[in-house]
C-alpha cells in the first residue's frame, strides 16, 4: 500500500504539471479557434489569469484525495481522468460561459469506457445518459437560453459516469447551487435578471465532489 501511495503521488504530481502546462495551453487554443462562441472574447486574458494557478492547484488537491480513496491503479486513473476534465470544463464555463465538444467527447468516452469495464452497470449508465440528456434538452428549449447545448451534453456525459441515481442527485444539487449563486449575484447587483449565467460548473463541481467522496 505504501508503494501504491508513492506511485500514485508521483502520478498526481506529473499530471498536475501536465495540466498546468498543456491543459492551460489547450484552453487557450480552443479560445483562439472558437472566438465566435465566446461570451467575453475581448477579455480572454483577463478572465483566464487566475485559472493558470487555480487549475493545477485544484487538481493537486483532488489528486491527493484520489490517491487516498482509490483501491486500485485503474480506479485511480479514472478518478484523475474525471477530475482533470471536470476542472477543465469548469474553467472554460466560468470564464467564457461555454463548454467545448473536444473536451466533452473525451470525457464522455472515458465514462463509456468505465461503464464497459463495470459491465453490470452499463445499462444503468446508458439509460442515465439518454434520460438525462433528453430531459435537459427539453429544459434547454423551455428555458429559452438559460441552459445551453453544452449543459445538455454535460449531463448526458455525466450519466455515463454516474448512473441514474447519482446523476439525479448531481442535477438537483447543481440546479439548487446554480440558482442560489445566480440569486446572490443579482442581490449583489453583479448580474441582472437577463444576464448570461454559467450553470455547467455547478453540475461539474457537484459531480467532482461526489467522486472525491465515494470514488467512481
Show which residues each predicted segment covers.
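A membrane-topology feature that recognizes alpha-helical transmembrane segments
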Residues: 1-216
Amino acid at each position: 500500500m505504501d508503494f501504491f501511495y508513492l506511485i500514485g503521488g508521483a502520478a498526481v504530481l506529473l499530471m498536475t504539471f501536465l495540466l498546468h502546462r498543456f491543459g492551460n495551453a489547450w484552453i487557450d487554443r480552443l479560445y483562439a479557434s472558437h472566438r465566435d462562441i465566446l461570451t467575453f472574447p475581448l477579455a480572454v486574458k483577463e478572465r483566464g489569469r487566475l485559472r493558470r494557478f487555480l487549475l493545477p492547484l485544484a487538481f493537486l488537491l483532488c489528486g491527493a484525495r484520489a490517491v487516498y480513496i482509490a483501491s486500485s491503479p485503474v480506479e485511480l486513473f479514472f478518478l484523475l481522468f474525471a477530475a482533470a476534465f471536470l476542472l477543465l470544463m469548469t474553467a472554460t464555463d466560468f470564464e467564457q460561459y461555454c463548454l467545448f465538444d473536444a473536451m466533452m467527447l473525451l470525457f464522455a468516452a472515458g465514462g463509456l469506457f468505465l461503464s464497459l469495464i463495470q459491465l453490470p452497470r452499463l445499462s444503468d449508465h446508458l439509460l442515465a445518459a439518454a434520460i438525462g440528456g433528453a430531459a435537459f434538452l427539453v429544459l434547454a428549449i423551455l428555458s429559452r437560453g438559460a441552459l445551453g447545448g453544452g449543459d445538455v451534453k454535460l449531463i448526458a456525459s455525466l450519466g455515463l459516469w454516474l448512473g441514474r441515481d447519482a446523476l439525479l442527485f448531481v442535477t438537483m444539487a447543481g440546479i439548487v447551487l446554480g440558482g442560489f449563486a445566480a440569486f446572490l449575484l443579482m442581490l449583489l447587483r453583479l448580474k441582472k435578471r437577463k444576464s448570461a449565467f454559467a450553470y455547467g460548473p455547478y453540475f461539474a463541481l457537484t459531480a467532482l465532489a461526489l467522486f472525491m467522496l465515494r470514488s467512481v
